[in-house]
């Protein structure tokens, strides 16, 4: 166990005693804190790299656009924490660098973003085996996924370049995670 795991265990044990949690609740709290710690670590690495590469704002815009839709649309996940790091760096560092330096055609990006909104309309929300969506929430999540992706697309019609392309990139990345090609691999 590393330092952070020890601190998480200590804090989870403290919360268990203080709030009279049973063992299952303790494990849920501990897992939640472990996931949070890993995600914060990934964000620090990703945004530090973005800052060093002078693309912080573009990474932030792409990531926020992605997350706003993903919160309701869900979608495929990396198979492990290691692959999550690799995918995060590829999607939110490498792709924004490519968009920035290769000046991707605006019409092409607009078309891909519009197509991606169509993917969100067709496939959101996309549950996974490990992260199922309760039936009572599917309709609401679908509605918000469509509304948010549509609003983001409309915003791109009014925002200046290059920011437009990074909002569009976030929409495109999230739409790709919704495609059914990822779900046969999970079963």
Curated annotation (Swiss-Prot):
Its EC number is 3.4.-.-. It holds the Pfam family AgrB. The chain crosses the membrane at residues 49-69, 82-102, 107-127, 143-163, 164-184. InterPro entries: AgrB (IPR006741). It is a multi-pass membrane protein. Keywords: Cell membrane, Hydrolase, Membrane, Protease, Quorum sensing, Transmembrane, Transmembrane helix, Virulence. The keyword Nucleotidyltransferase does not apply. GO terms for cellular component: plasma membrane. It is found in: Cell membrane. Essential for the production of a quorum sensing system signal molecule, the autoinducing peptide (AIP). This quorum sensing system is responsible for the regulation of the expression of virulence factor genes. Involved in the proteolytic processing of AgrD, the precursor of AIP. Belongs to the AgrB family. This is Accessory gene regulator protein B. The lineage of its organism: Bacteria, Bacillati, Bacillota, Bacilli, Bacillales.
